[in-house]
A protein has these predicted regions:
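Catalytic machinery of carbohydrate-active enzymes
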Residues: 1-275
Length: 275
């Protein structure tokens, strides 16, 4: 059968729920997806998608559904997650391009055997709950000072240049102004060791590609992250760090810093004092 899967809501929602195109493909459907323009490039990388559309096609289709109605239509339960993984991928030529660019910008400062970490600290400012999920970049300074790490901002939007003001203090490189779309961001993430981000579309991007990602969540987190968990059923490569008190990020950053120590294999006594 011919099936049209229609994106809706935010970009993160589209990235999260476009996975159902793969499920439909596994059931034997010929699947086209209608998504917002920023998502089109990564949607085109999916095995189960025949065509990626930016405007409503004339048809004909046997069936269609909005993405967020698919869980109901397929009787989804938590045991079925994550459905398929990974379901998006960066193009090899873009990965090669960005690996070369990152090598060039970091070679002067990056210490030997340093871990390369991407960072995003702010979501779209027009989202209703953005004031709860986004942080000031200054809040993350204790992470940037962690030994054995080199940082790359993949922040986009009005805050994409905030990191430039910290470049003289930390091994922190600003890539946002050079990123054209999600295919660039995904290729960059493929070259890094880890992404640390607040709850944004880039968190979904890394998770959908099954890349290591740590997400800082507000106490008032969205339904998709469930409650009381440090993992995500939607994204096996994701680790969640939750606020205990709404608006209080220090304890979250402290927890992430401790996790970085373990992840980097550095003894606590070797750590520089948080700033």
């Amino acid at each position: 059968c011919r099936f049209l899967l229609v994106g809706e809501q935010g970009r993160g929602d589209e990235i999260q729920f476009i996975r159902f195109a793969e499920w439909l493909y596994q059931q034997g459907a010929i699947v086209d997806v209608l998504v917002s323009e920023p998502i089109a490039g990564i949607a085109a990388s999916m095995k189960g998608v025949r065509s990626v559309l930016a405007s409503m096609p004339p048809g004909p289709y046997d069936y269609w559904s909005h993405m967020l109605r698919m869980p109901e239509r397929m009787n989804l339960d938590l045991l079925m997650l994550p459905i398929v993984m990974p379901y998006i991928a960066a193009s090899p030529h873009k990965i090669d391009y960005w690996r070369e660019q990152i090598d060039v910008v970091s070679q002067a400062t990056e210490p030997k055997k340093s871990r390369r970490i991407g960072v995003v600290w702010a979501g779209g400012p027009h989202t209703a709950l953005d004031r709860f999920r986004s942080v000031n970049i200054e809040t993350l300074k204790p992470l940037f000072s962690h030994p054995g790490t080199t940082w790359f901002s993949v922040q986009k939007g009005e805050h994409e240049c905030d990191s430039e003001g910290l470049a003289d203090q930390f091994d922190l490189h600003t890539l946002g102004p050079f990123i054209e779309d999600f295919t660039d961001t995904l290729a960059i993430l493929e070259t890094l060791d880890l992404l640390i981000t607040v709850d944004t579309s880039v968190a979904h991007l890394a998770g959908a590609a099954n890349l290591p990602v740590w997400v800082l969540l507000p106490a008032y987190a969205e339904w998709r992250w469930l409650t009381g968990r440090t993992d995500s059923l939607w994204y096996p490569s994701m680790r969640l760090f939750r606020q205990r008190e709404l608006g209080e990020w220090k304890s979250v950053v402290d927890e992430v810093r401790v996790a970085l120590t373990a992840w980097c294999g550095i003894k606590t006594t070797q750590l520089a004092a948080p700033m």
